[in-house]
Each structure stands twice: as structure tokens, then as C-alpha cells.
């Protein structure tokens, strides 16, 4: 599926990630320690889970959660036929190397595609009923102005949501993935 040009571009990106890591490794060390502490404090306050999509940010948060004590369960809400098939490949690669408590709760395809229902809210409601009303998310302020406002208003954790990488940059995320050889 990937062209030679795609793979060459990916190699160049990985080289930039390694260079960023070389130059900013101490910054990433602090970000990592801080993120694990935020997860631990949030998990200590009551039942929670890591909401995982198997995208790059979710993979980082799942890995950070695996370092936390207590380590909350990781839950994926696959969206049936509309789900990116590569998510399952990333999931399988991650689970083959990391012993975590993991569950899947199938989201109804209708919920994700009918235009009248908010798939994310339906997934959170299902998780609240099945696991816990509180969750750990991989959202980052850099991704949108709405997420930035959420971070400014609530910080890395509110009563129901934890955002341990909320202030990380995309470069931080890719450097973390490179440092820990995490799948994406």
C-alpha cells in the first residue's frame, strides 16, 4: 500500500524524530514524569479508563498509563466497518509488547455514521456504564482551538477527564514514539 516515496518520506520523518529526541531528551523526560504523575493522581481519585483510538496520541497515553501505578485499563471503541483497519494492526503490535489490562467495547456503526448521534459521546456513555465514568484522553491543545481552550480552562485533569499529554507538541509525541519504539 505504501509507495517507495512514502517509505522514504517516513524514514526522513523518523530521522527528524530521533534528532529532536537527541536535542530535547531532557524535556521529554520531564514531560513523561509529569504525565505519569497526572495519570496516577487521576487514577487514585477513583475508577477510570484510558480511551484509546490507536492513533499516535492514544498509543503514547496507553504507554504512559502502563508506567503508572495503579495502571488504568485501556479501552478501544472500534466503529465497525467505518473503523480504519490499520488501528487493529497498531493494537496488535502494542499488545504483543505491553502487558496491560485491555478491553474493547464495540460501538454501533449507526452511532458513528447517521449524522444525528455523537459517536464519541455514545462511546463515553457505554464506557461509563461498563467501566467507569472518568477517562484518560490523548487530546492535545495543539490540535484545535477548542482543545486549547479546554486545556486553558481545565488543565491536565478535571473531575471526569485527564489529559496527560494536553500540552505536548506533535514533535514531543513523535519523539516519545521513537524513544519507546511504539507502533503507529
Regions found by a protein language model. Give the residues of each.
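Nucleotide-activated chemistry modules centered on ATP-dependent adenylation/adenylyltransferase
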Residues: 1-184
Amino acid at each position: 500500500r505504501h509507495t517507495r516515496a512514502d517509505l522514504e518520506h517516513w524514514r526522513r520523518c523518523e530521522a527528524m524524530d530521533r534528532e529532536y529526541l537527541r536535542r530535547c531528551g531532557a524535556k521529554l523526560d520531564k514531560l513523561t514524569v509529569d504525565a505519569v504523575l497526572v495519570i496516577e493522581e487521576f487514577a487514585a481519585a477513583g475508577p477510570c479508563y484510558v480511551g484509546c483510538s490507536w492513533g499516535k496520541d492514544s498509543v503514547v497515553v496507553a504507554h504512559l498509563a502502563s508506567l503508572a501505578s495503579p495502571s488504568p485499563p485501556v479501552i478501544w471503541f472500534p466503529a465497525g466497518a467505518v473503523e480504519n483497519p490499520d488501528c487493529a494492526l497498531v493494537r496488535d503490535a502494542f499488545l504483543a509488547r505491553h502487558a496491560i489490562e485491555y478491553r474493547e467495547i464495540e460501538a454501533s456503526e449507526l452511532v458513528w455514521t447517521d449524522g444525528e448521534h455523537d459517536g464519541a459521546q455514545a462511546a463515553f456513555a457505554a464506557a461509563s456504564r461498563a467501566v467507569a465514568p472518568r477517562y484518560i484522553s490523548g487530546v492535545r491543545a495543539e490540535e484545535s482551538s477548542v482543545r486549547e481552550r479546554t486545556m486553558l480552562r481545565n488543565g491536565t485533569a478535571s473531575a471526569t477527564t485527564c489529559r496527560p499529554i494536553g500540552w505536548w507538541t506533535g514533535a514531543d509525541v513523535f519523539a516519545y514514539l521513537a524513544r519507546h519504539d511504539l507502533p503507529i
